Amino acid sequence: LILSLHGAGVNGLGQARSYSTKDWAWVVAPTNRRPFGYDWETFGRMDALESLEYALATFDIDPQRVHLTGHSMGGHGTWHVGVSYPHRFGVIAPSAGWIDREIYTGANFGTGPWGRAKAPLKTLDFVENLAPRTVYIIHGSADNNVPPSHARQMEQTLTPIVADLTYHEEAGAGHWWDASPDVPGTDCVDLPDMMQRMESVRLDPAPLAFRVISAG
């Protein structure tokens, strides 16, 4: 199963139509609530996980072959959900994903109550949770919506942590791109090499060591 999170202004149906038909996986693309879906944080994160649980209960799916991806806001959601629930996904594959709100917007939530409430949303504080996972990062080098610096920073941060890390930066590509328009599937979300990794990777059921941060 591939859980795919849409970007702002996109719904699940549009997201699903960006994928080619696959004989080895279901593509589950939920539509989040409200125009920006809480950036797949808080209630948005709950929506994603509840959709996953429904799919697992409805279809005959191997829970060791569940993967997570998304584009733009959904790429951020992939980072956030991935570092928060690393035990659920074999491959974590953000495309054009921003890291977190402070880095993306320049906001500073400080260390008071507001900052403590936002602590679980700081992706970089939890990246070590991805150590045993397969991570596949996709970004266009000419993306003027989510700068490629986000992907490059995550690659640099994860290189000493994640053994199975792939970084694909498409030269000259913008925010949404397809290098092979005559072939089914949109490459920025349905890149063949990434799909081959998902098809082959199985989630290791061994217990994980992971990091949590208390808001107190």
Q: Positions of the model-derived regions?
A:
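Alpha/beta-hydrolase-fold serine-hydrolase catalytic core, especially in secreted/extracellular enzymes
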Residues: 156, 160-216
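Mobile cap/lid helix-loop segments that gate and shape the active-site cleft of serine hydrolases
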Residues: 7, 14, 87-133
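Short beta-strand immediately N-terminal to the catalytic nucleophile in serine-hydrolase-like folds
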Residues: 4, 68-70, 95, 138
